[in-house]
Structure formats: structure tokens, C-alpha cells
């Protein structure tokens, strides 16, 4: 059983899908591991460390030769997979909705493409969930990015020269990224408030010492929502939420938006008029900018200023913490493959629940129901 870890080729992608730690663990399972030379360089993992952990290093073609499983962070370009074995697995973040044509090309190659972001939100799959591990770091980094752009301090400071007021931070969307953003902003000494469409998040917000800001008179999503995700809301709810947000946002110094809907463009949470209502020098960080953005006027890959307010739209935020993001992503992949490792067969054998959820292609066809529906 040969496992290949590729060097990422997407612009700005610094993460890597295997680390010396996970290579060592795969070797202990009985697998052969091949790592493309330089794969971990941008994340501070040297080729020598991979070799010491038991991996062989080589060119992409050498690494792919006879590989049974190909690991990636982002889905590799099908044209960059020379000589890929029929039936080989490709396990990575494949962006199936955004890169639907690429999924079809994986099928044409005869590959079995496994989209790690389709991992079901169930207890036994938590350690395999790349969305959670990467979103957690993104939420942390969003607060640091906001602090770097904000021309004032976060905590209240009482000095001989007078008092510095604490920054007011508002987090919109309380998933994994939002919860970490709340916790990080609180650690930095900010006054934090947060909102979400899911009723169950109210007590999570309170547990972190932040103030919940919720629409009270129109029903949102009870509980956690489908699989822990938000869905599209009614027009009535959207109008009530916009009114509530408008009155609250004008008093905030920092706003961090994290709202995503799987398979759909990101919901618009902040209008240009709401941006204009904020104080000059305020900062908004839009973590959903690559999916269309929560903030009107946000530009992917740029920090823009509108009405005196900075709108931060960094791409691929987890990659900006490449070492930790890689370590967690690589562990997610190892936890996934090792959980299904059949010692007698010497390879992983997926069960139906998780296999059917993440498998996009098999036998030359696209087979995932979410893509066929």
C-alpha cells in the first residue's frame, strides 16, 4: 500500500497534506510513503525530516508511480497526475461544488476522489473533520488580522495618561471559526458580542463570556441545524436580522463574519449602508470572501477601505498559519485512513456511512448524491 503526498500547486497554498509525524504513523501501519520533494518547505517541514520519518522523496511522477492513495490539501489538477493508477484514491479538500468540472475529470482518470470536506458531522468522524480543524485556526487568525489593521488597542488600559477603552468586537456566525474568534477576542481583552441564526448557539456564546445578539420575534433555526450547518433563512427572518444588525453594528469597532452555507454562495450579512454607519477606523474581516463574501464591498485577496472602514478579505486564511494548519490537516487524513485500516488487507476499507458521504467518483463515474441531485 503506497501513499503519496503531493506538493501543493495552487497559488498561495503553503500547507502540506502529510507531516513527518503522520508519515511515521503511516509507516507503522505498514504503508509505504512517498513525498514529493519540497512538499513541506512552505510549512517549515524539511525533506530531511520526512526521510528520517521513513518516507522516500522524489519528483511528482516518481511519487505517483503505483500510488494507491494520493493525499493533498487542495485537489490536485487532474493534468498533474501522470500515470495515476486506476482506482487510486485522491483524498483532499476537493471543493466539489465550486470545481464540479474537475470532479468529472477525476472520474475520467479512473480515480476514486474522496472529498474530505464532505465528512459527516458525527461523533466518530470528529477527528477526521478538516473543516473544523482549519476553521478553528481561521477564526483565531481573523482576530489577529483585525487587531493588526485596527489602529487602537483591544483591551481596556488604565494609564497615568488616561484610560483606553476596550475594543468592541462583533462576531457574525458562531460555528467553529466564530467560536474561536470569540475566545481569541476575549483573551485579547475586547468586549465581545455575537449572533447566529441557530438557537443552540446562544448558550455557546454565553459560555465564552460574550453577549448574544439574537432576533427574538421571528423563528430562526432551532437546535444546531442540519448537520450543524446553517441553511438559507426566510425573507422575514432576514429583514428582522438586518434591522437588528444595523442598530448594533454602528457601535462596533471590529466585525468578523464567518457565515457559510454548504453548496451555496455565502449569505450577505452586511450591506454597504451598514458599513457606512460604522465609525471611521473600524475593521471588518470577511472569512467567507472566497465564497462570495458576507460583506458588500469585500474583495478576495485584498484589504479595501470603504467609508473609512477597512474590509479585510484575505484568501485561504488557514494557509497563513501553515505549520499548525498542516499538522492538523495531516492528522485529520491519518485519523481517517487509520480508522478504516484493515490489517489483513493492508489497506483502508471504508464503511458505507462515511464512504458514501465523501466518495465523489468511482468506476469512471460521478457517484455522490449531493452532486447528482
Tell me the role of every PLM-derived stretch:
Residues 2-105, 109:
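An N-terminal-biased, well-structured beta-alpha scaffold segment characteristic
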Residues 23, 47, 81, 103, ...:
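Generic hydrophobic/aromatic pocket-lining and core-packing "Φ" positions
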Residues 68, 74-75, 94-95, 216, ...:
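Short glycine-/small-residue-rich Rossmann-like dinucleotide-binding loops
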Amino acid at each position: 500500500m503506497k501513499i503519496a503526498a503531493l506538493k501543493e500547486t495552487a497559488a498561495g497554498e503553503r500547507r502540506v497534506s502529510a507531516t513527518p509525524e503522520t508519515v511515521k504513523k503511516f509507516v507503522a501501519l505498514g504503508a509505504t510513503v512517498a513525498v514529493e520533494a519540497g512538499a513541506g518547505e512552505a510549512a517549515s517541514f524539511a525533506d530531511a525530516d520526512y526521510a528520517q520519518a521513513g518516507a522516500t522523496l522524489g519528483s511528482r511522477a516518481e511519487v505517483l508511480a503505483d500510488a494507491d492513495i494520493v493525499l493533498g490539501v487542495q485537489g490536485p489538477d487532474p493534468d498533474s497526475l501522470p500515470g495515476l493508477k486506476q482506482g487510486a484514491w485522491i483524498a483532499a479538500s476537493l471543493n466539489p461544488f465550486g470545481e464540479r468540472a474537475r470532479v468529472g475529470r477525476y472520474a475520467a482518470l479512473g480515480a476514486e476522489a474522496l472529498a474530505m470536506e464532505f465528512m459527516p458531522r458525527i461523533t466518530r468522524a470528529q477527528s477526521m473533520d478538516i473543516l473544523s480543524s482549519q476553521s478553528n485556526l481561521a477564526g483565531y487568525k481573523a482576530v489577529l488580522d483585525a487587531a493588526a489593521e485596527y489602529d487602537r488597542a483591544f483591551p481596556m488600559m488604565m494609564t497615568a495618561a488616561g484610560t483606553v477603552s476596550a475594543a468592541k468586537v462583533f462576531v457574525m456566525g458562531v460555528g467553529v471559526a466564530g467560536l474561536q474568534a470569540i475566545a481569541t477576542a476575549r483573551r485579547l481583552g475586547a468586549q465581545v458580542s455575537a449572533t447566529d441564526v441557530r438557537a443552540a448557539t446562544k448558550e455557546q456564546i454565553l459560555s465564552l463570556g460574550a453577549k448574544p445578539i439574537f432576533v427574538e420575534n421571528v423563528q430562526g433555526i432551532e437546535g444546531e441545524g442540519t448537520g450543524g450547518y446553517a441553511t438559507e433563512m426566510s425573507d422575514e427572518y432576514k429583514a428582522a436580522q438586518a434591522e437588528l444588525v444595523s442598530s448594533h453594528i454602528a457601535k462596533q469597532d471590529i466585525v468578523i463574519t464567518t457565515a457559510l452555507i454548504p453548496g451555496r454562495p455565502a449569505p450577505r450579512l452586511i450591506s454597504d449602508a451598514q458599513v457606512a454607519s460604522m465609525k471611521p477606523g473600524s475593521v471588518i474581516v470577511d472569512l467567507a470572501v472566497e465564497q462570495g463574501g458576507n460583506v458588500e464591498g469585500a474583495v478576495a485577496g485584498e484589504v479595501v477601505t470603504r467609508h473609512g472602514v477597512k474590509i479585510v478579505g484575505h484568501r485561504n486564511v488557514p494557509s497563513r498559519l501553515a505549520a499548525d494548519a498542516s499538522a492538523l490537516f495531516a492528522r485529520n487524513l491519518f485519523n481517517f485512513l487509520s480508522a478504516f485500516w484493515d490489517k489483513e488487507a493492508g489497506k483502508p476499507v471504508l464503511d458505507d456511512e462515511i464512504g458514501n458521504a465523501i466518495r465523489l467518483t468511482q468506476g469512471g463515474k460521478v457517484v455522490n448524491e449531493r452532486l447528482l441531485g
